Design a protein with these regions (language model features):
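Condensing-enzyme catalytic core mediating Claisen C-C bond formation in acyl metabolism
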Residues: 1-62, 163-231, 310, 319-333
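Solvent-exposed alpha-helices and their adjacent loops that cap or buttress functional pockets
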Residues: 8-11, 112-114, 141-144, 174-178, ...
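Acidic-glycine-rich active-site phosphate/pyrophosphate-binding loop
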Residues: 39-44, 99-113, 151-163, 256-267
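Glycine/charged-rich beta-loop-alpha catalytic/anionic-binding loops adjacent to active sites
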Residues: 86-88, 110-122, 165-169, 266-273
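Flexible, glycine-rich active-site loops centered on histidine and acidic residues
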Residues: 140-175
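Claisen-condensing/thiolase-fold acyl-transfer catalytic domains that form or cleave C-C bonds
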Residues: 67, 94-101, 115, 122-142, ...
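Phosphate/pyrophosphate-binding loops at sites that engage ATP/ADP/AMP, CoA/4′-phosphopantetheine
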Residues: 69-85, 226-244, 263
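Membrane helical hairpin/interfacial module
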Residues: 81-96
Length: 333
C-alpha cells in the first residue's frame, strides 16, 4: 500500500462555520432498469443485499442541477448572490461532451446571477471530491480573507451503461452511481453557521501491482479509511462515543459498515437510508445524508458528526459539530 499525506491543521485552528446544506437529486429509478442487472438475477440480489434499490437519474443538465441546489442554499441562508465572495465548483464525473468546463462554470454562475467573482474548479478526488472542495473553500477564507464561500458539487452520467462500477479491473460491480448535486456555504461568521468545521483529513491510497485482487483493494481501502477517521477524530478532540452519527457515502455499504464496526460503531450509528433511494451520488452522499438525518431526527445542538468520503483511491473524513438544534432555529425565526 502506498499513500500520500498532506499536513493537517488541528481542529482548534479551524474557526470556520458551515451553513445552508441543500441538494438536488434526479428521479428515483429502480436498479433493475439497468440491463446488466435485469439480465442477471444473482447480481441484482447482491446489490439489493447491499442496500441498493434505486438510483437517481437527472432530467436536467449538470449546471442546472448545480444552480438549483445552490439557489436553495442561498435561500436557506437568507443570502443574495452579492453576499458570496467566492465560489468553489467540484466535478467528479464530467459528461457534458459539448461543453468545456469554462462554459459549464458560466452556465452555473449565470443562473445564480453571479458575476465578477473568484471561482475555483476542483476535480480528480472522486468519492472524496467534496472534501477537496471544502478544503479549498476553507483556505480561501483563512488565507485569502474571504467571508462567505459557496461550495457546489455536481455530477451526472449521460450513459446508464456506466452506472455500475467495480472496485478493481475486471471485478464485479460494487455500486450504482446516481445523478445529483449538493451545496453549502463555508463562512467566517460562526454565529450564523449551522455547523462548526472541527477537522478534516484526506489521503490517496492505492494497491500496486498488476495482479491486484478485490481482497487487496478491500484491505487497502479499510486501512486508508481507518487512518483518516482516526486522525480526523484526534484533530477534533472527539472520542468515538461522542459521535452522534456516521454519515457514510453510499459506496459499498456492507464493506464500510464492517469497517466501522471495528471502531465500535453499530448500525444504529449510521444513516444509510438514502442508499435505497438515490444510489451512490458520488462525493455528495455524506452531505445529503447529513441533511436528511438532521431534518428527520432533529439532533440537539452540540452533536458531533463524522462524514466519510470512501472511494477507490481517495479517502477523507470530516468532523462537524451542530451549533443550533431545530428548536433553536424555530425560536430564532
Amino acid at each position: 500500500m502506498q499513500d500520500t499525506e498532506h499536513s493537517t491543521i488541528p481542529g482548534a485552528s479551524l474557526p470556520i462555520g458551515l451553513r445552508g446544506i441543500a441538494y438536488y437529486v434526479g428521479s428515483s429509478v429502480p436498479i433493475q432498469e439497468l440491463s446488466c442487472l435485469a439480465n442477471n438475477a444473482e447480481l441484482l440480489e447482491r446489490f439489493k443485499a447491499a442496500h441498493f434499490r434505486n438510483f437517481s437519474r437527472s432530467d436536467i443538465s449538470l449546471p442546472e442541477q448545480a444552480a438549483h441546489c445552490a439557489q436553495a442554499t442561498l435561500n436557506k441562508c437568507g443570502m443574495q448572490a452579492g453576499d458570496i465572495d467566492a465560489v468553489v465548483i467540484g466535478f467528479s464525473e464530467l459528461r457534458e461532451w459539448t461543453s468545456y468546463p469554462e462554459q459549464l462554470t458560466y452556465a452555473i454562475l449565470s443562473r445564480l446571477g453571479m458575476n465578477h467573482i473568484p471561482v475555483v474548479g476542483v476535480t480528480l478526488a472522486g468519492c472524496a471530491n467534496v472534501t477537496s472542495s471544502l478544503r479549498v473553500a476553507r483556505n480561501m477564507i483563512m488565507v485569502d480573507g474571504y467571508r462567505n464561500v459557496l461550495v457546489v458539487e455536481t455530477n451526472l452520467l449521460r450513459d446508464d451503461r456506466r452506472r455500475l462500477e467495480g472496485t478493481a479491473p475486471g471485478a464485479t460491480p460494487e455500486n450504482v452511481f446516481g445523478d445529483g448535486a449538493v451545496s453549502f456555504v463555508l463562512t467566517r461568521d460562526n454565529d450564523t453557521a449551522d455547523f462548526d468545521l472541527l477537522a478534516m483529513d484526506q489521503i490517496v491510497s492505492y494497491t500496486e501491482g498488476e495482479q491486484t485482487t478485490i481482497q487487496d483493494v478491500i484491505a487497502t481501502s479499510t486501512a486508508a479509511s481507518r487512518r483518516v477517521i482516526g486522525r480526523a477524530l484526534d484533530q477534533a478532540g472527539v472520542q468515538r462515543e461522542q459521535v452522534k452519527c456516521v454519515l457514510l457515502n453510499n459506496m459499498n455499504i456492507l464493506m464500510m459498515a464492517a469497517l466501522f464496526r471495528l471502531y465500535g460503531f453499530t448500525h444504529a450509528d449510521f444513516h444509510i437510508e438514502n442508499t435505497l433511494r438515490y444510489g451512490h451520488v458520488w462525493s455528495a452522499d455524506s452531505f445529503i445524508n447529513l441533511h436528511d438525518y438532521c431534518e428527520t431526527r432533529k439532533p440537539l445542538a452540540g452533536a458531533h458528526f463524522l462524514l466519510i468520503g470512501h472511494g477507490n483511491t481517495y479517502y477523507s473524513a470530516l468532523v462537524l459539530r451542530l451549533r443550533h438544534s431545530a428548536s433553536d432555529a424555530a425560536q430564532a425565526n
